[in-house]
Swiss-Prot record:
GO terms for molecular function: deaminase activity. Signal peptide: none annotated. Belongs to the RutC family. Pfam families: Ribonuc_L-PSP. GO terms for cellular component: cytosol. This is RutC family protein PM1466. InterPro entries: RidA (IPR006056), RidA_CS (IPR019897), RutC-like_sf (IPR035959), YjgF/YER057c/UK114 (IPR006175). PANTHER family: 2-IMINOBUTANOATE/2-IMINOPROPANOATE DEAMINASE RIDA, 2-IMINOBUTANOATE_2-IMINOPROPANOATE DEAMINASE. It comes from the Bacteria. It comes from Pasteurella multocida (strain Pm70).
């Protein structure tokens, strides 16, 4: 049975979708853009945007009763692949700080545009151990 996951600690959906769905043994998040859920603001630089998107993913994963360590796959959408190294560095910091046993599998794709003209969006798949 599918369960909808919602938390006020991540931005509300800006379209006809939910923050995540829990399939019982697997959690699928919608893409998280770097909107601070408390202020509605978007950080200016790509490193802070990457961190905010990851923190939003974390909030959703934790609302489902899981941890960052349960994330097995992410998809990262960036507006500019020239930001790849900066995003990678923050991504690595985030997963190390959150005690991920390795790193999740990942795809990274450059896209023409993202909602609210942000520089990054991240979605994740997490599994229950």
């Amino acid at each position: 049975m599918t369960k909808v996951i919602h938390t006020d600690n991540a931005p509300a959906a800006i379209g006809p979708y939910v923050q995540a769905v829990d399939l019982g043994n697997m959690l699928l998040t919608s893409g998280q853009i770097p909107v601070n859920p408390k202020t509605g603001e978007v950080p200016a630089d790509i490193v802070a945007q990457a961190r905010q998107s990851l923190e939003n993913v974390k909030a959703i994963v934790e609302q489902a009763g899981l941890q960052v360590a349960n994330i097995v796959k992410t998809t990262v959408f960036v507006k500019d692949l020239n930001d790849f190294a900066a995003v990678n560095a923050e991504y690595e910091r985030f997963f190390k700080e959150n005690n991920h046993p390795s790193f999740p599998a990942r795809s990274c794709v450059e896209v023409a545009r993202l909602p609210k003209d942000v520089g990054i969006e991240i979605e994740a798949i997490a599994v229950k151990a």
